[in-house]
Amino acid sequence: GREKEARSAVNVFATRERREGAIPPVLYLSAEVAPLSKVGGLGDVAGSLPAALAALGVPIVIITPWYQGIEERVPLARLPIELSVPLEGRVERFRVGRAWLPSGVTVLALANDRLFGQPVIYDEPRDRERFFAFSRAAAEFARLFPPGIVHANDWHTALALVWLHRWFDDRRDGPRHALVLTIHNLAHQGITDIGYARRLGFEAEELLFEEWQRYPGTINVLARGIHVADAITTVSPTYAEEIQTPEFGEGLDGLLRYRREALWGIRNGIDVELYDPATDPVLPDRYNAEHLEGKVHCKRALQAELGLVEDPTALLAGVVSRLDHQKGLDLLLEVIDKVIARGVQIALLGAGDPELGRAFQALADRFPGQVSVRLGFDPVLARRIYAGADVVLLPSRFEPCGLGQLIGLRYGAVPVVRRTGGLADTVQEWEEAKGMGFCSMRPLLQHSWRRWSVPSRCMGALMNGVYSFGRRCKAR
């Protein structure tokens, strides 16, 4: 009855019997999935990678929280499934809704009004309770409708792997899921106190590793996910090497060196159909690598929209970023006066650290017509900045991969980056007509940029050289 109806609704798990040699179904768990929900790069990846895998014939379903308001972005149909989760002496119940991404990939949204009935994705300090319960609900779903692979992302869903490992590790009969964990940013680990873990039903030793413990009396959800996963991936080869060192390992470098044989650095990509200046509906004009006139119009329109001097020969530098220490925006502030003195225009869009926001706003007040600062998150303006900018600045202190440089390339904006993590893997130093960008701020400080242009043959090479998830998946 209800189970058959539910199983039929979740079409890629419609049968328990799988042909020998068939591609195993994947259950993909993420706290955010664009375009349903998005704060940063995780949402972009969760919306793009499953679509690329599905295009290659991989049966895949995404599970994500049902935040208030996502039903306004995509139609959601209620399924006859309810997941019950024990949490701190009570039972939390999750309803299940089904939607489809524009690519056709099935998304299951787990609804619990108390935990996720708000329009925000992250809500410190309640995130511990919210994502612990969501991870348990996702694990319960995997127990009811067993896939072949469960793929979790970051600490928000790593606990699902811990539950599945606990339930199935010692069973010789029945399904044994392959457990995959992708680390998008090692700095966020889901650290909480031991007492809370016990109230969830864990024994302390299940989540505690004294030799890799950063803070006494705490548990580390991401560390436990790393420990139980059959495969661990991160979003660039360089970042996979960096996180095994004390400098970038965030206290888990020893554990990651211990699991190095299971650790893979796979470079991120973007959805080149979603990010396509030839079809992007929010741009004032369209263009592609062969016909670049539209980019000139986009630059002029952006200058007008942001109150910058309308000068087609001025170098326009775009910054679309969180305002925080990791992203290196304070490093940009240290040299930005010199950059501006070279004739560079700045268009910044970002949210985060209020102090950094005030510093950039003061800069805009000092240089009207040359610096524009918009504080907040505006995905439409972000794409217009990529389309109108000549260069995009990414001065990150560390960067697991970064998508801004890839989106910039797709829209014909040359990336200027610090050589770290995925930025080092995706941006080849510009030399004559070779390379894809600059790996330091030095070029901006050494030259006058009052007469800026890129030869059209070079621009075409930049725009066509973008890493897409389809290309990355086929390569694997």
Description of each model-found segment:
Residues 2, 7-476:
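Catalytic cores of nucleotide-sugar-dependent glycosyltransferases that transfer UDP/GDP/TDP-activated
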